[in-house]
A protein has these predicted regions:
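CoA-thioester-processing core
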Residues: 1-47, 78-82
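Well-ordered beta-strand positions
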Residues: 5, 45, 49-51, 57, ...
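C-terminal long alpha-helix characteristic of the crotonase
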Residues: 8-13, 55, 64-116, 129, ...
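Hydrophobic alpha-helical segments typical of transmembrane helices
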Residues: 30-33, 42, 95-98, 118-121, ...
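Terminal peptide-recognition signature
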Residues: 34, 58, 99, 138
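C-terminal and late-domain segments of enzyme folds
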Residues: 124-125
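Short, basic/aromatic-enriched C-terminal tail that caps enzymatic domains
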Residues: 134-149
Length: 149
């Protein structure tokens, strides 16, 4: 649940927090993350019953973004291919990092502070080489080639 984007391989497992069956709670962030991802009622039900759910059910509870079919080897290859869209030279990694920071920090602070954080993060990107490349590529109707600068 701590992953930014969660992708499962069809029929390769189940999702849940069964720690209650050991007489403990889902520590190390389990209760906090699950509550934020799926809402209080669903999180409570999952944690107090300790039941595991299919990836399809987990997808319906916003715990999994995508479910892909294929062998373990194909899945690994497909994941790496899919993730390449978020890395150099396809995306500006500083912008990706700032998006992650805003999305992770923002919900924990008042809305007006989240907007201020977003403005600060955006301002930090405008003078970057990658922002200049992205804007130039847009104007010139070509694909940007980001460098991480």
């Amino acid at each position: 649940m701590a992953a930014d984007i969660r992708i499962a391989r069809k029929n390769a497992g189940k999702v849940g927090l069964p720690e209650i069956n050991l007489g403990v709670l889902a520590g190390t962030g389990g209760t906090a993350r699950l509550t934020r991802l799926s809402g209080k009622a669903m999180a409570l039900e999952m944690m107090v019953t300790g039941e595991l759910m299919s990836f399809e059910d987990a997808h319906g509870c916003n715990l999994i973004n995508h479910i892909w079919e294929g062998s373990a080897e194909d899945f690994r290859r497909d994941i790496l291919d899919w993730c390449s869209q978020f890395t150099l030279p396809n995306k500006a990694v500083k912008a990706v990092g700032n998006i992650k920071r805003s999305c992770q920090t923002g919900p924990e602070i008042p809305f007006e502070y989240h907007l201020a954080l977003e403005r600060e993060l955006q301002a930090s990107l405008f003078n970057s080489t990658d922002a200049k490349e992205g804007i130039a590529a847009y104007v010139e109707k070509r694909v940007a080639n980001f460098t991480g600068q």
